[in-house]
A protein has these predicted regions:
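Intrinsically disordered, low-complexity activation-like regions
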Residues: 1-184
């Protein structure tokens, strides 16, 4: 029996793609609160592995990636919890890409299969994101993939996460942040 408090993949996709890019990548406290109110139980179920059956289809895998990779960045902005499901999202993304689920969907949906690679602090994952973006994305997707990869090449991690994750910034990282750094 399905838990009525949990969203379906279609509800996740309708909400996310109905909001559009102007909401996805900018700070909006009301949008963050709406995600938290509507999707927190769904996120918690996904993070506990209870929604793994969503991976059976391209649309389901996409919805699971949004729940694991995008929603926490909104729901838990400024907290270590924003990144808590990144490893799980990356595992889902790798499996979905191996099944060519990304190529079954058009842009911008396709790009969300690549963001868990882009959010990884592992250079191999970053290089895979650049490769996937060059093959299957648009110029904007490639630009952001390359920017993220360059930061990991330079620092081995994302300096803009240091304060939230309780990490001490190196002098080079602090200079980068002081110069405007990267807040994405």
């Amino acid at each position: 029996m399905a838990d009525a408090s949990l969203a379906t993949p279609a509800q996740v996709l309708d909400f996310w793609f109905g909001a559009g890019p102007e909401k996805w990548f900018s700070r909006d406290d009301a949008f963050d609160a709406a995600i938290r109110q509507r999707f927190l139980p769904t996120y918690e179920a996904a993070a506990a592995g209870r929604l793994n059956d969503w991976q059976a289809t391209s649309e389901g895998a996409l919805a699971l990636l949004i729940v694991l990779d995008q929603f926490p960045r909104n729901m838990f902005r400024g907290s270590p919890r924003a990144y808590a499901a990144d490893a799980l999202a990356l595992t889902v993304a790798k499996r979905a890409v191996a099944q060519n689920f990304d190529r079954q969907l058009d842009l911008p949906k396709r790009n969300f299969f690549y963001l868990p690679f882009q959010h990884s602090e592992n250079l191999v994952d970053q290089e895979r994101c650049v490769e996937l973006s060059r093959e299957n994305s648009d110029a904007e997707g490639v630009k952001w993939a390359e920017l993220h990869a360059d930061i990991i090449r330079r620092f081995g991690r994302f300096p803009h996460r240091n304060a939230v994750l309780g990490r001490v910034s190196t002098p080079e990282e602090q200079a980068f942040l002081d110069a405007g750094g990267f807040a994405g």
